């Protein structure tokens, strides 16, 4: 028997990347799963692998930014499994175009916050209400070291959202502490996932990041799965309102501000320069395809050759 046998875990953003890793990790430890993300096909692929590990899996597609979808997914989870023991609030997006703050458009800002903050809160609220009724439950929010200090990556909306989610974790961790519900977060550093792969490969950041991480390497997926499972487990029963940094020592060394500067020149004028990236490094064209797919109604032209 695994440490999560008999427990149901709801994972948002479960179709790939960190969410996929969390799903398989919990399945290996006996948990039953409710997986949600926008793509049913991608979710089913993850679900099949988890079922092969012996997990009962419910696939519940939905958009984390749509309140009706969040409510429906939570109701489905309770109807199918009878309870939710743990919520892994993982769904998130970022903007790797490198747009300077003074040039940032509100459409992109609102899109990122609608998922990274508003969507996360709606899941906390809906699942939290259920857990409070049962006087039992664990919530683990996936934050980021970007939410704990300044950085030079020009991901201003992502930074704001993750910082707010970290503070929300601390607030609810205290408010619900005597009602049987623990709320914690994990703040990853750079972990190899599909979300950060464009930055690592397209901008040649892997060596830069490693050089500014005390462990001198980038984290692996398995190295974030374990800490998240720890906080969701009974082993962490006296931990709440805590943000666990899993970053190879980056934050402790003040490394969040030592990532190489992208746009020093941008602060000297107000000319929009979307997507110029690092000096001497061309952004990958598929960044713009991903951004165009991710933000409805927005078109990001490829940079001029």
Give a label for each model feature.
Residues 15-17:
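Conserved glycine-rich cofactor-binding loop
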Residues 61-73, 106, 223:
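The beta1-alpha1 cofactor-binding region of Rossmann-like NAD(H)/NADP(H)-dependent oxidoreductases
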Residues 98-101, 105-113, 209:
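Substrate-binding pocket helix/loop in short-chain dehydrogenase/reductase
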Residues 124-125, 170:
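A short, exposed helix-loop element centered on a Lys and neighboring polar residues
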Residues 129, 174-178, 237:
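Alpha-helical segment proximal to the catalytic Tyr-Lys
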Residues 140-164, 169-178, 191:
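Catalytic loop of short-chain dehydrogenase/reductase
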Residues 185, 207-239, 246-248, 273-305:
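C-terminal helical subdomain
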């Amino acid at each position: 028997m695994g440490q999560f046998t008999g427990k149901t875990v709801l994972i948002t953003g479960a179709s790939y990347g960190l969410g996929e890793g969390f799903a398989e990790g919990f399945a290996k430890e006996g948990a039953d799963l409710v997986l949600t993300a926008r793509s049913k096909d991608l979710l089913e692929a993850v679900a099949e692998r988890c079922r092969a590990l012996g997990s009962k899996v419910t696939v519940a597609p939905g958009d984390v930014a749509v309140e009706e979808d969040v409510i429906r997914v939570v109701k489905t989870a309770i109807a199918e499994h009878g309870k939710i023991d743990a919520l892994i609030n993982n769904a998130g997006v970022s903007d790797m175009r490198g747009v300077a703050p003074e040039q940032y458009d509100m459409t992109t800002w609102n899109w990122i916050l609608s998922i990274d903050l508003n969507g996360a809160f709606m899941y906390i609220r809906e699942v939290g209400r259920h857990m409070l009724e049962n006087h039992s439950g664990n919530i683990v929010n996936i934050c980021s070291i970007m939410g704990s200090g300044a950085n030079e990556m020009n991901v201003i909306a992502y930074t704001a959202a993750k910082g707010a989610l970290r503070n929300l974790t601390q607030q609810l961790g205290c408010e619900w502490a005597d009602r049987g519900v623990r709320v914690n977060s994990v703040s990853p550093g750079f972990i190899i996932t599909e979300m950060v792969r464009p930055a690592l490969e397209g901008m040649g950041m892997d060596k830069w990041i490693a050089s500014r991480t005390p462990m001198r390497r980038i984290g692996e997926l398995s190295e974030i799965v374990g800490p998240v499972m720890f906080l969701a487990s009974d082993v962490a029963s006296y931990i709440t309102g805590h943000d666990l940094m899993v970053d190879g020592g980056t934050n402790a060394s003040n490394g969040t501000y030592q990532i190489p500067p992208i746009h020093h020149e941008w602060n000297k004028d107000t000319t929009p320069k979307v997507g110029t990236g690092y000096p001497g490094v061309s952004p990958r064209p598929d960044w713009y395809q991903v951004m165009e797919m991710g933000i409805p109604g927005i078109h990001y032209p490829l940079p001029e050759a």
